[in-house]
Structures are given as C-alpha cells and as structure tokens.
C-alpha cells in the first residue's frame, strides 16, 4: 500500500515513554533523529517557524552528500538547541504526525534529546536559575529584596554584568517583581449560587501561575474581578508550585514529576468537586491539558485535572454560549493589536480571546497569529536573544500597524517582547501593553 502525504484521520499524539531506559539510549535517539530529519529534509514546510529547521536544512545542504547522512551526529545538538517546544510544527504544519505511519512528532523528539542531554550533563547555573521560577519568585518578592531586584534589572551596568556572568541578555526587558504576590493578597469570593451551564461548571478554581503570582498579580486580580462581575464563585488550590513547563523545556523530567506531585492532588480534588480550573498563562494551561497527560498517561488525577482545565477566554466564550455571561460593556477599547501565543494555538480551542474582545462595542481587533520569539526562558538567553528578536520581527511590525491603542497577548512575556520590538524600531509607543483579561475588565468599566 502506498504511503500518502497527510491523513484523513484527526491527528493524535502518543504518550512519551520517558521511563523506558531506551528513551535515554544515545544510539536509539540518534537513529530516530536521523529518521525524522530525513523526512523533514524531504518536506521543508516548517522552514519559517523557528531556527531549528533552517539549522537542520543548512547542515544538510552544506554537507558532503546533500543528504542527512552527510551531517555529523555531533551536530544534531545544534538543531535541538534551536527548538523551544512551541509545538507549532506539530500542530499547524507537519503532514506526517500520527496516525500517519511515519509517526513524526518533532517537538517530542527534541524534548527527548533535551532530556538525554540533561541526564548526561545537567544544566548550567543560569538555566537552573531561570527555570526555577517558583523559587526565584519567592526570593525576589521578599519585602527587603524586591526593590533591589527591580532596580538591578533596570540598571544597564548591572545588566551588563549579568550578561557576562550569567548569560542573560542585557538588552532583553525583564519583568518586574511585585511587592504583593497574588496568592497572598486574594480578594475573597462572594458565595454566589453555583450556576452550572451545559458547557461550563459554575464555580472556578484559579491556578495563579508563577508569573502572574510574582510578576504581574494585576492580571490575576483582573481575572477575579471578571469572575465576580459575572457572579461566578472562585477559589484557589490550597498549595501551588510551578506548572513544570520551564523544567520540561530544560529536559528535567524528574523535576517535572516532583512539581506534578505537588500540584495535581489538590487540583484533582477540585476537579472532582465540580470546579473548572483556569490558568491565566497559556503555557501553564497547555502543560496541564497536554504535556502532563502525555508524560503520565496512567495517572487518573492528571486526567481529571486536564479535563477540568480551561483557558480563561475559552471558559468565558463557552459561558456566554450557556447564556450565563454578562455583556454589559461600557468602555470601548479602540484599536487593539492582539497576538495569539504559540501555546494558546497549541490548545486547539480556536481564537476565543479575539472572539471575546470583539464583543466590546467600539473595538477593532488586529489579530496576529505567529510566534513572537520569546518562548519561555529561551529568548532572554544571551546566545539566543538576537535570533529571538529576528523571529519576532514580523509580529512586531504587524502589531504596530494602524497605531493601536493597546498591544495585547494572552502570554504576558510575549506581550512585553512585542512592545520592546516595536519600541526598539520606532521609539516609545503610545500603545499600552495590557493583558486581554485586563482589557475585558476595562471594557466592563470595572475599577
């Protein structure tokens, strides 16, 4: 039977067999890399997505044979280093994903290579620091320390030293740390009656995320205000650690499991008690919806959490379809340039944020669906910063079109990178960077 390009069946994804000793076998890994790279070489649809594919194709084209057998196995790592696990090749481009018999899952092959590298070599101090978001946040928000950290991160001379000593790009804008983390300053929910809809549970558990908790708690407070405005009772889990996505991108799967063991039991209890679980950062949502179930396919608690997990705007749009969301918007937003992050696209729920913003009268939404180049910790590393800005340049240009009133992305770090890209080119922008949850709060006229 002839193997055809593409498939008439819906894409599926196999669990990651990361506990199998063969997963870490160098020869087995290199054989699978060679097989997949050969398929990618014959296709090349993903060349515009990230640096991994141009790096691979340059290695092949500049090799002695012009084929994958002309590429030294030692150079495979150069491809792996350029992959930041955005998942767009798998989700939007590749015609050979399962159930196609060629069974190509490029991101998870790169994850396997990162896991092997981590097992062999560990990680640098810089990478351990950047991916320890929860620990870093707890330390940086200590009252005596937080102002010193923020001042240091905004001082060019200090940033120059940080680049030389740690490898954190001096030119990359870093987020401020909050004096009052979200989880320590939560508005208590009113005990509204629970109104379940056909598509949505009527009560919400919020997973704060490291970034919103320690860096931009206002985003979390705005989410709570939106829930309160719509009389949806909410609460937080009793305990919370990092979702594990930064450690996943590092290949540190053992720490991913440790974090899972902290987060999943309380979240699973909430899921089984009928709560929808909302996370205001797409990478965290994707971690619970997709990556943890693929890493721990036999864990029923992980499955329960995945089934209860919603992107906030996915929840609000479905709540609206249930006839249980208010549309009493009083403030137009004007021109909004809205960016759809990679990890929001990877959830396959459609453009729910754009749909919700378009509910607001007097609002024009310019939607940009392309990688902004920040990609977790990857885009602040000195060796990748210039490449990350190059990847984001088309997004920066399109987001600046029509002189917007707001620049917005579901991913807060992508939003910051976009505004930096705009201002690096054209100087200070009149556009305000605001999260879509903040925009909806403004549109409701909520203070």
Could you say what each language-model-derived stretch is?
Residues 24-38, 68-83, 228-230, 357-359:
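Short, intrinsically disordered, charge-biased short linear motifs at domain edges
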